[in-house]
UniProtKB/Swiss-Prot annotation:
GO terms for cellular component: COP9 signalosome; cytoplasm; nucleus. The lineage of its organism: Eukaryota, Fungi, Dikarya, Ascomycota, Saccharomycotina. It is found in: Cytoplasm; Nucleus. It comes from Saccharomyces cerevisiae (strain ATCC 204508 / S288c) (Baker's yeast). This is Cop9 signalosome-interactor 1. GO terms for biological process: adaptation of signaling pathway by response to pheromone involved in conjugation with cellular fusion; cellular response to pheromone; conjugation with cellular fusion; protein deneddylation; regulation of protein neddylation. Keywords: Cytoplasm, Nucleus, Signalosome. Coiled coil: none annotated. Component of a COP9 signalosome-like (CSN) complex, composed of RRI1/CSN5, CSN9, RRI2/CSN10, PCI8/CSN11, CSN12 and CSI1. In the complex, it probably interacts directly with CSN9 and CSN12. Interacts also with RPN5. Component of the COP9 signalosome (CSN) complex that acts as an regulator of the ubiquitin (Ubl) conjugation pathway by mediating the deneddylation of the cullin subunit of SCF-type E3 ubiquitin-protein ligase complexes The CSN complex is involved in the regulation of the mating pheromone response.
């Protein structure tokens, strides 16, 4: 039996896209993006000696743009897939997820599913996940229990059920209640420069949520300055233009992630985003220096 491992971030992304949508359609559809697992992967986990026939790991989703009568907007879908490939070149489209908002007769649901799958035969989808949200879930486990996975046979038919495994993606931080590594301003070096230092949260009585919100605001301000720089940069060479588009897309993805709000691993995620933004800032400064040398 096949095993499909889910990142909890992928489930969160599905819920976020669903809640932020104003569509009143009965079904929302998502492409499942991921990779195949083998024993060399860090996230490979043996299954009590009974290895599954095939193991895959879902780490991202792409919302499928739908039109009336369950028609897929193929042009917009292709654009979303290509945009994802800009930053994740080795992605594999593994399957499709049906988020159902109404309790329907199974025969009707299967007909809708077959109609959608018929339009996606070119993607050679392997799996179908059904996610029922017509009942309000009060816990993560209840949401997990409402997901059922199946093989897709002959491109459009629902086959045998598969095993779903959900990874919590938890990050272990020592002394999480006592000490955090946070950026603090150091005006003696540079008014816009932040240095990292360990702060004792109990002694300083720093409000974590307030700090997180303030940090995100600072990051968004830095991102905005980079966007203005890239848009105003006078470059006629094609290599720069193509690279500029890639960086702008990356910045757009960062902004989207930051605007989603706090998570249980906010400090870990913020550190990653800070590092990504610093790398983008370095790239911008390199272009600026290169342009000055050409003059």
């Amino acid at each position: 039996m096949d095993l499909l491992k889910f990142s909890s971030l992928a489930i969160s992304e599905i819920n976020f896209l669903h809640e932020s949508s104003f569509d009143s359609i009965d079904h929302s559809w998502f492409l499942l993006i991921g990779c195949k697992l083998d024993q060399d992967d860090e996230i490979y986990i043996p299954i009590n000696g009974n290895e599954a026939e095939s193991q895959w790991y879902i780490e991202k989703v792409i919302r499928i743009p739908m039109q009336e009568n369950d028609k897929i907007n193929q042009e917009r879908l292709e654009r979303r897939i290509n945009l994802t490939k800009v930053t994740q070149k080795d992605i594999c489209i593994l399957g499709i997820l049906d988020l159902c908002q109404l309790e329907e007769d199974e025969n009707i649901t299967n007909k809708v599913t077959e109609k959608v799958l018929t339009q996606l035969t070119a993607l050679a989808l392997k799996y179908l996940i059904k996610y029922n949200v017509f009942r309000q879930h009060t816990s993560f486990q209840e949401a997990v229990n409402s997901l059922k996975g199946y093989k897709i046979e002959n491109s459009v038919q629902i086959g045998a059920e598969i095993i779903l495994d959900f990874l919590q993606d938890k990050v272990q931080i020592k002394d999480v209640n006592d000490r955090y590594q946070i950026p603090t301003p150091n005006n003696t070096v540079d008014p816009g420069f932040d240095e990292f230092q360990l702060i004792d949260m109990k002694d300083k009585e720093i409000n974590i949520q307030k700090y997180n919100n303030n940090t995100i605001r600072k990051l968004l301000e830095k991102i905005n300055r980079m966007i203005i720089f890239l848009k105003n940069y006078d470059a006629t060479d094609k290599p720069f233009s193509s690279t500029q588009d890639v960086i702008l897309r990356k910045i757009s993805m960062l902004v989207t992630q930051l605007q989603r709000g706090g998570t249980s691993d906010m400090n870990y995620l913020l550190d990653n985003k800070i590092n990504e933004i610093k790398l983008l800032e370095i790239s911008c400064k390199q272009w600026e220096i290169s342009n000055m040398l050409k003059k």
